[in-house]
Amino acid sequence: MIKKAIIPAGGFGTRNLPVTKVIPKEMFPVGSKPVIHYLVEELKESGIEDILMVVSSHKNLIVDYFDSSLALEAFLASKNKLHLLREHPIPDIRIHYVRQPYAKGLGDAISFGKQFAGGEPFAVVLPDDLIFSANQPALGQLIEAYTKYQSSVIGLKETKTEDLHHYGVIKGEPVEKGLYRIQDIVEKPKQNPPSHFAAAGRYIFTPDIFNELEALEADSGGEVQVTDAIKASLGACTVYGKLLEGERYDIGLQKDYLKLIYDMLKTEKNPQ
């Protein structure tokens, strides 16, 4: 079973400037909880026991959020309001942190988790993407596919043509309903995307991915892309793509973030 997950949270959040100069996108409010709280809840519900958050020097708010605040607890106790904390408890899960000195891409961030993974398969969950499913959590769907096929699996969502340039897009061969054997993957295609199936911020990797990441050189923008590592592994390994059930919200896109807030207000309850 997959028990470890990496959350890469060290980037500058340039798609959400200028607010991300002071507030990490992972801490954007969704109701009374920040984005990353929902993500950690999903991991907990999927059976994850240990999380490694890859952060940078400007992401201390994330660390503070998951830490205890004795001063706040004492204040609430004095006012007989401790129930306010119990209404939205921090998930009971082990969280570790590592500092990424420079924002050098998703692949670089994942490489900081090699020791944490310890030679075992592991999950990667991007904090840009919230996926709410009425049934099985998104990562749980991937873990189920990995358990069956014992190979790396990428979470996919069918995506509108005009939005495909934001994501890695696969070319795949159908294996069963909702599951594809990946033949190619293109990072943020500007034209002629190979399909409408885009990476949805959920991955299960075998430890071999670290060898591929170490062999890569940074791209023209100075970043190491996990898409390139996946593409490089396709000759020697089978990588699957799993269509995920549930509603996806890309927090980096203002239209998605606003839609999430609207959907919450419309239903008058959290989307879970």
UniProtKB/Swiss-Prot annotation:
Transmembrane segments: none annotated. GO terms for molecular function: UTP:glucose-1-phosphate uridylyltransferase activity. InterPro entries: GalU_uridylyltTrfase_bac/arc, NTP_transferase_dom, Nucleotide-diphossugar_trans. Keywords: Nucleotidyltransferase, Transferase. It comes from the Bacteria. It is an enzyme of class 2 (transferase). Belongs to the UDPGP type 2 family. This is Putative UTP--glucose-1-phosphate uridylyltransferase. It comes from Bacillus subtilis (strain 168). The gene is ytdA.
